[in-house]
């Protein structure tokens, strides 16, 4: 088994980190740069910052927030939200991001994946998929989980890979913020359908939840927000517990 990654997520609106349950009832969690630095120091392998209202509000990414956060980091930094063109991606990279995440814009115009990948490399392109379970599998939602698309999550992940995505960030909308565990079945379905890394998101609450999504869900990385922001767990202790279960981790010194 390859080394698995623990990723801390910052959902940002109006320049502040927020966290809710199933994309609703958002609570303030703090300053993005401060939280990113804290999570990095505690052993997170990567930071993901998602400007969760940029698409819905029809604006670009909060570049100053990205810049201030990037200045505090020494680990890979992914930024998403409001990226609609290769030029938008370039501005986010210039602000300090190592990778960009695209979601709604890729659903509207899938060739955007190829455009950004050809310019910056597939390794820099993460396609984010927000999915909610239905009778036949899981449906992809756009615009921060507000708009159903009719697309099947597994089929869209396959297409994203074919178009040149370097990673998939899969969020279970049903599990998001619940701390009841990742959707291992959905994660395994997507992981088995593609060859690129899949990041599982939504539902982290205990170390065992991470172990389950790595072992049963076949995830390459697991992302969490509220358990890190509100002090339920930190990456260092989490990694130690996972390593004790023979799950390969990059352990902090």
UniProtKB/Swiss-Prot annotation:
CDD domains: HisF (cd04731). Belongs to the HisA/HisF family. IGPS catalyzes the conversion of PRFAR and glutamine to IGP, AICAR and glutamate. The HisF subunit catalyzes the cyclization activity that produces IGP and AICAR from PRFAR using the ammonia provided by the HisH subunit. It comes from Acidobacterium capsulatum (strain ATCC 51196 / DSM 11244 / BCRC 80197 / JCM 7670 / NBRC 15755 / NCIMB 13165 / 161). One of its GO terms (cellular component) is cytoplasm. Its main location: cytoplasm. Keywords: Amino-acid biosynthesis, Cytoplasm, Histidine biosynthesis, Lyase. This is Imidazole glycerol phosphate synthase subunit HisF. Disulfide bonds: none annotated. The lineage of its organism: Bacteria, Pseudomonadati, Acidobacteriota, Terriglobia, Terriglobales. It is found in: Cytoplasm. The gene is hisF. Pathway: Amino-acid biosynthesis; L-histidine biosynthesis; L-histidine from 5-phospho-alpha-D-ribose 1-diphosphate: step 5/9. The active site is at residues 11, 130. Its EC number is 4.3.2.10. The keyword Lyase applies. It catalyses: 5-[(5-phospho-1-deoxy-D-ribulos-1-ylimino)methylamino]-1-(5-phospho-beta-D-ribosyl)imidazole-4-carboxamide + L-glutamine = D-erythro-1-(imidazol-4-yl)glycerol 3-phosphate + 5-amino-1-(5-phospho-beta-D-ribosyl)imidazole-4-carboxamide + L-glutamate + H(+). Heterodimer of HisH and HisF. GO terms for biological process: L-histidine biosynthetic process. GO terms for molecular function: imidazoleglycerol-phosphate synthase activity; lyase activity.
């Amino acid at each position: 088994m390859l080394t698995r990654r623990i990723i801390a997520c910052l959902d940002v609106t109006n320049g502040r980190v927020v966290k809710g349950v199933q994309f609703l009832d958002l609570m303030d969690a703090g300053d993005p740069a401060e939280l990113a630095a804290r999570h990095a120091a505690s052993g997170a392998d990567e930071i993901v910052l998602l400007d969760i209202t940029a698409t819905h509000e029809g604006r670009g990414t909060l570049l100053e927030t990205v810049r201030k956060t990037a200045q505090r980091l020494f680990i890979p930094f992914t930024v998403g939200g409001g990226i609609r063109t290769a030029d938008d991606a370039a501005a986010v990279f210039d602000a300090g991001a190592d990778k960009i995440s695209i979601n709604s814009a890729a659903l509207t115009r899938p060739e955007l994946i190829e455009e950004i990948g050809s310019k910056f490399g597939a390794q820099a392109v993460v396609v984010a998929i927000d999915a909610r379970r239905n009778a036949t599998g899981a449906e992809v939602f756009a615009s921060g989980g507000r708009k159903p698309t009719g697309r099947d999550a597994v089929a869209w992940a396959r297409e994203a890979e074919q178009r040149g995505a370097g990673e998939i960030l899969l969020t279970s909308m049903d599990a998001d913020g619940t701390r009841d565990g990742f959707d291992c079945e959905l994660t395994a379905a997507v992981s088995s359908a593609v060859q690129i890394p899949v990041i599982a998101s939504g539902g982290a609450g205990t170390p065992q939840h991470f172990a389950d999504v790595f072992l049963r869900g076949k995830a390459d990385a697991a992302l969490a927000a509220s358990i890190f922001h509100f002090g339920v767990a930190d990456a260092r202790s989490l990694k130690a517990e996972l390593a004790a279960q023979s799950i390969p981790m990059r352990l902090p010194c």
